[in-house]
């Protein structure tokens, strides 16, 4: 099985190292100094338990790799529309596409038994370009519960969790999800197959849609955001609005809002991905984590004043930093 990992950052690089070490035929698409370091010294993952270094094929040109049996897309959601044509060079009608981006994915409404079946979410897929180039029928959803960062080119530090939940958008069990789960499990990762991947998606997003923008605006880590009553209440109000949208889409949560907030706080002095991106001068996943949720609120007729206000503020902060279009 030929596996191409598009985006060898913290998540993609970790997957590449683990899968390669387990005997899979893995190649990575990377760029810049990170790519140069991988070519020169291999790819390294450090954790409290061990340090692993592997040498594997790496390029910034997808056509050098050719068609893959499985493509794991580990780009940020905001980068995906710009990379879609390059990713498509790895894809045949038989290729399995695994998406790992945070937030609402472009394929969210594919085959969904709802009035909005096959609706294109413009916030993450302007004009339906992703839907066209990366067909949702070939997608396996993957929700990542994992914390790591690239601490220097070619070196990733893994700090928290290693869970990669998998699921077909239509909820069916399939040979491809089962084989992918087995492959990841053999690589030492937790890879449960979920009957409803959207529920898993919303459980992660429920916290992210509030605490990512809050962290970008305040500069605070999640332990401080969840322990300050005023900020906790702000997050709770946003999450209450989002829960009504989720309910309208057939999603119910397995925990209360406060339990979800406490789960976020339990990670400790962790900077959200949005805050990390802001500090490094990189575009943030504003539209996937919050803009798309507000879009779904309008679609389902659920008012979201708190979320809309937060969206305006964090977009303003991003524009001030030159990281969001006017």
Regions found by a protein language model. Give the residues of each.
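Internal alpha-helical scaffold of NAD(P)-dependent oxidoreductase catalytic cores
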Residues: 37, 90, 125, 129-204, ...
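NAD(P)-dependent Rossmann-like dehydrogenase/reductase catalytic/cofactor-binding core
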Residues: 224, 232-326
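Residue-level detector of anion-binding/catalytic polar loops
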Residues: 2, 25, 190, 252, ...
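Rossmann-like NAD(P)(H) cofactor-binding subdomain of soluble oxidoreductases
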Residues: 52-55, 60-151
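Short internal beta-strands
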Residues: 28-31, 166, 294
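NAD(P)+-binding Rossmann beta1-loop-alpha1 motif at the extreme N-terminus of oxidoreductases
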Residues: 1-50
């Amino acid at each position: 099985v030929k596996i191409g990992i598009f985006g060898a950052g913290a998540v993609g690089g970790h997957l590449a190292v683990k899968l390669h070490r387990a005997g899979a035929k893995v190649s990575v698409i990377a760029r810049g100094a990170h790519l140069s370091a991988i070519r020169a010294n291999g790819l390294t993952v450090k954790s409290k338990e061990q340090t692993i270094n592997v040498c594997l094929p790496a390029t910034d040109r997808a056509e050098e790799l050719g068609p893959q049996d499985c493509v794991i897309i580990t780009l940020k959601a905001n980068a995906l529309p710009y990379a879609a044509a390059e990713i498509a060079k790895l894809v045949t009608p038989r290729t399995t596409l695994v998406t790992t981006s945070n937030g609402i994915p472009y394929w969210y409404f594919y085959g969904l038994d709802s009035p909005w079946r096959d609706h294109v979410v413009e916030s993450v897929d302007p004009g339906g370009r992703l839907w066209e180039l990366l067909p949702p029928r070939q997608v396996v959803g993957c929700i990542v519960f994992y914390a790591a960062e690239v601490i220097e080119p070619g070196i990733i530090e893994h700090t928290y969790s290693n869970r990669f939940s998998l699921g077909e958008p239509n909820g069916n069990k399939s040979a491809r999800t089962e084989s992918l789960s087995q492959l990841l499990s053999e690589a030492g990762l937790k890879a449960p197959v979920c009957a409803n991947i959207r529920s898993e998606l919303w459980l992660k997003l429920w916290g992210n849609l509030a605490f990512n923008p809050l962290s970008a605006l305040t500069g605070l880590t999640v332990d401080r955001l969840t322990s300050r009553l005023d900020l906790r209440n702000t997050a709770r109000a946003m999450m209450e609005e989002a829960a009504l949208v989720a309910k309208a889409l057939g999603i119910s949560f397995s925990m209360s809002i406060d339990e979800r907030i406490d789960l976020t706080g339990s990670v400790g002095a962790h900077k959200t991905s949005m805050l990390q991106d802001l500090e490094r001068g990189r575009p943030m996943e504003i539209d996937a984590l919050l803009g798309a949720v507000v879009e779904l609120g309008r679609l389902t007729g659920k008012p979201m004043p708190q979320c809309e206000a937060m969206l305006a503020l964090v977009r303003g902060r991003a524009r001030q930093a030159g990281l969001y279009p006017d």
